[in-house]
Amino acid sequence: MKIARHKVNRLSRLTRIFFGGLVIFLVFWSGWAQQPPSSPLGPLSARTGLLLKDSVIIRLIQASSGDLAFDTVSHLALWHRLQTSESYTRAAEWISQKARDIGLEQVGIERFPADGTIEYFGNTMPPQWKVMKAELWLTSPFSMKLTSYAELPLSLAMHSTSADVEAELVDIGAGIDDKDYTASVKGKIVLTTSNALRIYDRAVAKEGAAGIVSSWSVPDFDSLNRRPADFPDQVGWQRIPGKGVEGPSHFAFGLSARRAQELQSLIRQGKTVRVHAIVEAKLVPGNLEVVSGTIPGSAYPNEEIVVTAHLDHYKPGANDNASGSASILEMARTMRQLIENKEMPPPLRTIRFMWVPEYNGTYAWLSKHLNDPVKRLADLNFDMVGENVVKTNSVISVCYTSDSNPSFLNAVMESILDFVNRFNDDRYPAQTDFYIGSLNGTRNRAAWRMIPFVSGTDHDLFNRLRIGAASLGAWPDDFYHSSEDSPDKVDPTQLHRAVVLGLAAIDTLAYADSEQAQDFAQLSLVYGRQRIAHSEFSASRSLLSATKNGFHEADHLAGNLMAHVFSRERAAISSAVMLARTPKARSDVQRVVSWLDGDEAASRKKVEDIARLRAGELGLTRSPLPLTEADKRAARLIPIWNEGKELFSFEYVQRILAQDSSAQIPKIKAALDEVSQRLRDRGVDELTLYGFQDAAALYVDGKRSIPDIRDALAAEYTSIAVEALELYFRAFEKAGLMKILDK
């Protein structure tokens, strides 16, 4: 019995030890299991070139879907999503419900009045255009329905209002020259190949035409990429004037080139062609509606990464811009899923997703939120991102921030773009873990590129506020702003790649903490050196090609360019300081900035050597360009924005001062047009030139003098006379937007 009791006691002790150890193990295991996932960021990856860990980018690829995004595109393409319209409201409500369903927080639709007179930052907001019915019929020499709003909403020009007119159809060709109106068009409906808006004042307001039928579909700025004959069944998206909710009845219809040619043939045969236009539509007060939702930041909730896409446009508007709207919804869904499944921690910063009416909605939203107690670190914009590039003749690109707003964001975006290209440039890549495709998509190769800053979409406004802002988009697109911008031109694979780029950028920015500030600075240094090398090449080439008469200017501009790009890249690296929260982290960033000092000395020496070589070949002595009296006067002048006016544009200045001859607006416009033409002659594309008239204003920071701004423009674009710039800024001052300090 004693032995038995001893064995029992021993077993009891062993049991207690076992279960005690098990409890301790379970406690530790439970604690380990409940640890939140680690930061997605790490040191620069040798495989991917990203600041994201390899395992994270793989998970982002696998968790996201281009096919789900494509389904969203197909749904949005069912609505004629014009700004302030009832169909836009339905699309906004649908998106907001989807945002709630996937778990975004603070989801809501903000409404801003718009009636054709209300302005935000000097931009007049359009009224609601309410269409009940619109049809265009051929009534002679036979009866046939030519088009209808119900079947093709885009065929009725925006802002057309109620009319019931049966009249003779007369062909006026382009409708621009006097010869097009040798025969009276009063009371008749004119057939034209021009944009209805372009000829409206002449044909309707002056000559008395009852209405317009237009076969136009190719914007002037896209004429290098397509011609009307290339797509004979394409109907272009058009509008006519419609400033307020009251005014005379007027209308315009759009037809395809093929249908218009049929009508022209009847007219040439000498037959009397009559058409019947029936329009029930009116302009009424409406609202701009902005949908937004957030993933709140866990550590720095008052710092935001803003992700934007414009929700509006014509039906179908698949690539422009159901694709961008669908892409950011898929980014939000993927982020919420990974956080909810504890595969990723909550972001340190708040991520705000916004679906907006392009430009106007962002202007309106900023009018309310510009002074919110939050720090907006970046805007990532997605506009026309789903193109099947083979079908649409497109190139996918990411634009740098403007040189007036240098940012580490450029290096972040370029590193992700390089990653996408590297692992998606073959149809059947060897490294499939980094391949981004879709079940129902193509195997088109990725050949994305970085391009100079362009405006034309919503990132432009954040850039003006000196927030790092980049935009992903496709250009050209053969179906842009036409009836053929349909879901069959959208590629789920391309959507998936856009989503992954967005997720990678969002995560890199939203999870960065103070200890990563130096990593961002170093990444900016690497990519900045690449851009500097390109500028060094450009400066050297311009010197070697300089003629005797043009050498001194080329020498000056080459030196100016090198000074500019080093200043830009120092500022881009320095911008990483916004992530630094300790003196050491800030010091680490500035140490990286200093590494450019040696680079600049070496780079300038190489350019100087080439300048001396070329001067010798031409038999010239190098000398600086002499300062003119205008230079000396302007050097004392420093433009400063008046508070809250930074988003006002030169277009507003022109409108406000149109009747003020002392502002010399025609002279300023002529100077800007001359510079734009020189850039075109150099092969600069229209997308880059879009918004150029505001480029000088972007450099206004209260520190730069007018010659400083001239020099910056010369480096980023081309030279402009300092006298023209002084007039330009005087006009801004006269319009109440700036003041000019005379130091």
Identify the function of each model-found stretch.
Residues 56-63, 77-87, 171, 189-195, ...:
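Second-shell loop/turn segments in exported
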Residues 71, 334-364, 372, 382:
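Short helix-loop-beta-strand segments that form the rim/entrance of peptidase-like active sites
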Residues 148-180, 237-320, 330-346, 350:
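Soluble metallo-hydrolase cores and metallopeptidase-like ectodomains found primarily
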Residues 74, 84-86, 147-244, 249-251, ...:
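Extracellular/luminal Protease-associated
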Residues 239-242, 252-253, 260-261, 300, ...:
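Metal-dependent peptidase/peptidase-like ectodomains
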Residues 688-743:
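Long, charge-rich, low-complexity alpha-helical segments
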Residues 35-52, 62, 66, 74-186:
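Noncatalytic luminal/extracellular "stalk/propeptide" segments of secretory-pathway proteins
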Residues 19-29:
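Bacterial N-terminal signal peptides
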